[in-house]
Design a protein with these regions (language model features):
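Juxtamembrane amphipathic/hinge helix adjacent to a transmembrane helix
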Residues: 118-153
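Cytosolic/nucleoplasmic/matrix-facing N-terminal domains/tails
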Residues: 1-125
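C-terminal single-pass membrane-anchor helix
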Residues: 139-180
Length: 180
């Protein structure tokens, strides 16, 4: 799964800001404030309409956040996918908010231990991510990237066309000034 996502410029391991930073110690709060300055900011709305934020190291818009697509397409739940190298991808979406500390690959033993004690999230459905769900996310990401590419081309073409018109008008004005 990880290689498929990386091959399609889809990001995991994004650091999602918790709903409240007040329970964190001052060092962790300072680390989150430092991430605001150093990383790309990904913003979405949870089910109550509040803004939620994630931070990733890749600043290019060519990369899409996997967790936001899962949240938008499939809603609340505990999503996981086992890989061959004894790691498991884990994502928890609760009340439309991506839970901080998830959207990452963890050791399978740790995942199994977490699933034995799901008290805080026992109301959420546990879902194994399948190839079908991955392909839906990849398709949506490609469609979004295509629309971004079209918008970039339109903006660049508009600027180029505007520049050409400006230069033509400037040349015409200079011609009338010189010709008298």
């Amino acid at each position: 799964m990880e290689k498929i996502l990386q091959g399609n410029n889809i990001l995991t391991d994004i650091l999602w800001e918790p709903e409240s930073l007040s329970y964190l110690d001052p060092g962790a709060q300072a680390a989150f404030r430092g991430m605001v300055k150093a990383n790309r900011r990904l913003v979405y709305k949870d089910t109550s309409g509040h803004l939620a934020v994630g931070y990733c190291e890749k600043i290019s818009t060519l990369y899409e956040p996997f967790a936001i697509y899962i949240k938008e397409l499939f809603g609340d739940g505990i999503y996981f996918s086992h890989s061959d190298d004894n790691f498991t991808y884990l994502l928890i979406v609760n009340e439309g908010r991506i839970v901080s500390g998830t959207d990452c690959f963890i050791e399978r033993e740790f995942f199994d231990e977490l699933m034995r004690h799901p008290e805080q999230y026992e109301h959420l459905e546990v879902t194994l991510l399948t190839e079908v769900q991955l392909s839906v996310v990849i398709e949506k990401c490609h469609a979004h990237q295509l629309s971004l590419k079209r918008r970039r081309r339109f903006i660049i073409s508009s600027i180029l066309f505007g520049g050409i018109i400006f230069l033509a008008l400037l040349a015409l004005a200079l011609h009338f000034l010189v010709a008298g």
